[in-house]
Structure formats: C-alpha cells, structure tokens
C-alpha cells in the first residue's frame, strides 16, 4: 500500500493513474501475523476469511478483487467464493511453487489476453 500511496504524490510516476485508483478503493486486509494496518481506505478483517468474504459479497457495490497467497486463494476456491479467476502466467521459470487447487475444482476458460511483456492472463469462470 505504501508504494501506491507514494505514487499518488508523484506526478512524474508513470503508475500514478493506477495508483490513484488503488488508493481510492476500500481494502480489507487478512493477516495471520499483523493485528493492525495503516493505509488509506484500509481496514483489518475481524472475522475469518470465508465469513468476511461472504459478507462482502452480499454488500451493494462493484466487484471484489482478491490478491493473496496460495492458502488465501485456496480457501476462496474451496468455499465457492470465486466468480472469476484470473491467472497471470509470467514467462519466468521458478521451478517450484504452491498450488492453489486442493481438489477437483471445475473452471472453464472465458478468455486470454497476451501482453507485450510476455505475460498472459487467462480468465476462468467456475463451472456451475
């Protein structure tokens, strides 16, 4: 969050337009280690992930974007809380990693977007 907040104050930063959006959005933070959060429009979740996300999905408003590690994303998938899954495929081999799928979770490809830097974003939706 600090990066985006700093970028909003720098008119020469090429990421400023995106930073302005990111800083303006409300953010709910889930953490196993931190109990407090600082940042513009940021609050610390007070409920377990599944319960908190279910409540957020019931609120009026726009889409929810969830960024997180493998455990976080796995819990969303396992509990049917994903309406759309965007997988960013980066052409860098790391050799190892954590899976976000713990069982059979049917998704179907909605579309793919290729970017000049080599990254491909595959958008999947759950099979209902």
Model-derived features with residue positions:
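Enzymes that bind and transform nitrogen-containing heteroaromatic metabolites
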Residues: 1-128
